[in-house]
């Protein structure tokens, strides 16, 4: 096996192990809450299905971005991916709106800081703020 293939296989195995761990943890939480048990085979099957679905999502997201002549996946691609599930689409849209609002707030805060704090010096005798000239 070539070195690149070995690295890819190793990375895939680590991702599968991580997915299996998370699925196992979630199944344990549900089992504790609902007082039921999950067999190891059920957890393994859920893990495998989850991993394959994530692979499918990743490929679709890459294709959506490539179709739009971009190399970066953005929120519109994720929304397009979730279009078939109304509840998932609504949740992703809500999260997207929150992220956009937070991003806008951060930009406004930075803008205010640069406008008010960037070109100001203090006059120590009178303790007043004097704007510096931009000459």
UniProtKB/Swiss-Prot annotation:
Entry keyword set: Cell cycle, Cell division, Centromere, Chromosome, DNA damage, DNA repair, DNA-binding, Kinetochore, Mitosis, Nucleus
GO biological process: cell division; DNA damage response; DNA repair; replication fork processing; resolution of meiotic recombination intermediates
Localization (cell): Nucleus; Chromosome, Centromere; Chromosome, Centromere, Kinetochore
Keyword Endoplasmic reticulum assigned: no
Segments of this protein annotated with the region Disordered: 103-135
Subunit structure: Heterodimer with CENPX, sometimes called MHF; this interaction stabilizes both partners. MHF heterodimers can assemble to form tetrameric structures. MHF also coassemble with CENPT-CENPW heterodimers at centromeres to form the tetrameric CENP-T-W-S-X complex. Forms a discrete complex with FANCM and CENPX, called FANCM-MHF; this interaction, probably mediated by direct binding between CENPS and FANCM, leads to synergistic activation of double-stranded DNA binding and strongly stimulates FANCM-mediated DNA remodeling.
Function: DNA-binding component of the Fanconi anemia (FA) core complex. Required for the normal activation of the FA pathway, leading to monoubiquitination of the FANCI-FANCD2 complex in response to DNA damage, cellular resistance to DNA cross-linking drugs, and prevention of chromosomal breakage. In complex with CENPX (MHF heterodimer), crucial cofactor for FANCM in both binding and ATP-dependent remodeling of DNA. Stabilizes FANCM. In complex with CENPX and FANCM (but not other FANC proteins), rapidly recruited to blocked forks and promotes gene conversion at blocked replication forks.
Protein name stated in the entry: Centromere protein S
Organism of this sequence: Xenopus laevis (African clawed frog)
């Amino acid at each position: 096996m070539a070195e690149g293939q070995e690295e890819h296989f190793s990375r895939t195995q680590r991702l599968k192990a991580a997915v299996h761990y998370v699925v196992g943890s979630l199944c344990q939480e549900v089992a504790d809450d609902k007082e039921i048990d999950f067999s190891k085979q059920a957890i393994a099957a859920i893990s495998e299905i989850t991993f394959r679905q994530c692979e499918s999502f990743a490929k679709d997201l890459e294709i959506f971005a490539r179709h739009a002549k971009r190399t970066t996946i953005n929120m519109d691609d994720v929304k397009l991916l979730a279009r078939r599930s109304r509840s998932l689409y609504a949740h992703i849209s809500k999260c997207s709106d929150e992220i956009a609002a937070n991003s806008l707030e951060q930009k406004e805060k930075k803008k205010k800081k640069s406008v008010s704090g960037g070109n100001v010096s203090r006059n120590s005798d009178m303790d007043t703020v004097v704007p510096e000239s931009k000459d």
